[in-house]
Amino acid sequence: MIGELDFPFLGAGSTGGACGFAVANPPLYGMVSAGGPSVFNNGIGCGTCFQILCNGHPACSRRPITVTITDECPGGPCASEPAHFDLSGKAMGALARPGQGDRLRSAGVLRVYYRRVECLYRRTNIAFRMDPGANPYYISFVVEYENGDGDLAYIEIQPADGEFIPMQEMRSAVWKISSGSPLTGPFNIRLTSAESHKVVLAYNVIPANWKPNETYRSVVNFK
């Protein structure tokens, strides 16, 4: 498929974005992109992966790269094509021939070939980064580094000595649940992928003494 990309977005060391990912850290290493409305898809596109090939400019390497969607490009030029990508500086440089990164970054809007691909984070398992406002009555976290589809259909949380409870997806990669009584850990998290409907269980992944802003890594990922 043919789309367009440009470079007004992130530097290699940037963090955050609408999806809330730590984009400069492994395994992303800054190889990220903001997506136009059809790609970001109201947050459903957070964490999805795309292969991009640039061959319409002399500075293009004509070698594909893979990027993860971590932010939104909401309107204006971003909505002018069926698909639009705003690449990070590092990702834009990776599309270029050796020594031609700055030339490609200054080229403006480029026509590219793209396709959705499965995410593959080697030697990395799913992680849960607790939201700054999370508390025992309001559990919320960002889910990071899912292999495969990269997007999730369902997440369920199981408190200590309790049943699995469905969580609600916010307009990003954040999932939340509110409770009238405090929820106590350790917590099991069950995740269902959106496309393949595969299920993985992260057992006791969030400890009883969890804290906001902390990241808890599981020992599982989609295959």
From Swiss-Prot:
Gene3D superfamilies: Expansin, cellulose-binding-like domain, RlpA-like domain. GO terms for cellular component: extracellular region; membrane. InterPro entries: Expan_Lol_pI, Expansin/allergen_DPBB_dom, Expansin_CBD, Expansin_CBD_sf, LolPI, RlpA-like_DPBB, RlpA-like_sf. May cause loosening and extension of plant cell walls by disrupting non-covalent bonding between cellulose microfibrils and matrix glucans. Residues 16-124 form the Expansin-like EG45 domain. It comes from the Eukaryota. It is found in: Secreted, Cell wall; Membrane. Disulfide bonds join C19-C46, C49-C119, C54-C60. Glycans are attached at N213. Its main location: secreted. Residues 137-218 form the Expansin-like CBD domain. The keyword ATP-binding does not apply. The gene is EXPB6. It is a peripheral membrane protein. It comes from Arabidopsis thaliana. Keywords: Cell wall, Disulfide bond, Glycoprotein, Membrane, Secreted, Signal. It holds the Pfam family DPBB_1. This is Expansin-B6. GO terms for biological process: anatomical structure morphogenesis; plant-type cell wall loosening; sexual reproduction. Belongs to the expansin family. Expansin B subfamily. The keyword Nucleotide-binding does not apply.
